[in-house]
């Protein structure tokens, strides 16, 4: 059994980086506090996660299940690295993709009420190695709900890769199998993570400002 890594642990007192050090779209200039995880660091960590995934799951057909919308950037980049490993290996395996859409946030709070509002026929997961790819684990309730749903289709194996895991007292204790970064209890946006659908077009993971929260509040 593989030991779960906490990922790159970012401390509670990590200040992040000044916005002026990076290219930030002008329309978000007043809406962010700091750059928290630069895009290059995200990509380097994702490349290593791809290797870990293939080491643990690469013996059988993998179905990569993307949790939309926030997971799509991480999903695309992770799969690019996995595909590169697959085509350069002496032993390659088939890989297919599926998508599911969940809703559990309003403004900056997880509602605790997870709704499946889109997705393909999950019966295709039966007997497969399933890799669920998520942007962030906050309380963990959303992922527990999704795992219960997926397991109804009797996959051979289910593993979860999450770019971010938040340290929060609201956590139910769930930890994914593959973690990019463990972060403090801050509301972050960018790299497809949104605040009421805004900020998905940022390359970096950033901390939203109070001005930004007020501006884009639902």
Swiss-Prot record:
Gene: HPRT1
Quaternary structure annotation from Swiss-Prot or TrEMBL: Homotetramer.
Residue(s) of cross-link: Glycyl lysine isopeptide (Lys-Gly) (interchain with G-Cter in SUMO1): 115
Binding site for GMP: 69, 134-142, 166, 186-188, 194
Pathway the protein contributes to: Purine metabolism; IMP biosynthesis via salvage pathway; IMP from hypoxanthine: step 1/1
Active site: 138
Compartmental location: Cytoplasm
Superkingdom, natural source: Eukaryota
Residue positions, PTM Phosphothreonine: 142
A Pfam family matched in the record: Pribosyltran
Protein name: Hypoxanthine-guanine phosphoribosyltransferase
Modified residues annotated as N-acetylalanine in this record: 2
Cross-link position per record: Glycyl lysine isopeptide (Lys-Gly) (interchain with G-Cter in SUMO2): 115
Any GO BP annotation: IMP salvage
CDD domains: PRTases_typeI (cd06223)
Annotated cofactor note: Binds 2 magnesium ions per subunit. The magnesium ions are essentially bound to the substrate and have few direct interactions with the protein.
Binding site residues for Mg(2+): 194
Recorded GO MF terms: guanine phosphoribosyltransferase activity; hypoxanthine phosphoribosyltransferase activity; magnesium ion binding; nucleotide binding
Family of this protein: Belongs to the purine/pyrimidine phosphoribosyltransferase family.
Cofactor: Mg(2+)
Keyword terms: Acetylation, Cytoplasm, Glycosyltransferase, Isopeptide bond, Magnesium, Metal-binding, Nucleotide-binding, Phosphoprotein, Purine salvage, Transferase, Ubl conjugation
EC numbers on record: 2.4.2.8
Record field: catalytic activity: IMP + diphosphate = hypoxanthine + 5-phospho-alpha-D-ribose 1-diphosphate; GMP + diphosphate = guanine + 5-phospho-alpha-D-ribose 1-diphosphate
GO cellular component, one term: cytosol
Function: Converts guanine to guanosine monophosphate, and hypoxanthine to inosine monophosphate. Transfers the 5-phosphoribosyl group from 5-phosphoribosylpyrophosphate onto the purine. Plays a central role in the generation of purine nucleotides through the purine salvage pathway.
Modification N6-acetyllysine, positions: 103
Classification lineage: Eukaryota, Metazoa, Chordata, Craniata, Vertebrata
């Amino acid at each position: 059994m593989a030991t779960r890594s906490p990922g790159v642990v970012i401390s509670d007192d990590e200040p992040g980086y000044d916005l002026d050090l990076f290219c930030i779209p002008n329309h978000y200039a007043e809406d962010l506090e700091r750059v928290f995880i630069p895009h290059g660091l995200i990509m380097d960590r994702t490349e290593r996660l791809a290797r870990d995934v293939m080491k643990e799951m690469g013996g059988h057909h993998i179905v990569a299940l993307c949790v939309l919308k926030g997971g799509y950037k991480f999903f695309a980049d992770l799969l690019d690295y996995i595909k590169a490993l697959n085509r350069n290996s002496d032993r390659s395996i088939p890989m297919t993709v599926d998508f599911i859409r969940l809703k559990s946030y309003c403004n900056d709070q997880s509602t605790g009420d997870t709704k499946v509002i889109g997705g393909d026929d999950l019966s295709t997961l039966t007997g497969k190695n399933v890799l669920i790819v998520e942007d962030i684990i906050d309380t963990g309730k959303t992922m527990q709900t999704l795992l219960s749903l997926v397991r109804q289709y009797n996959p051979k194996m289910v593993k979860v890769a999450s770019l971010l895991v938040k340290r929060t007292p609201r956590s139910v204790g769930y930890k994914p199998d593959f973690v990019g970064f463990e972060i403090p209890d801050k509301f972050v946006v960018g790299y497809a993570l949104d605040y009421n659908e805004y900020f998905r077009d940022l390359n970096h993971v950033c901390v939203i400002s109070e001005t930004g929260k007020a501006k884009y509040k639902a």
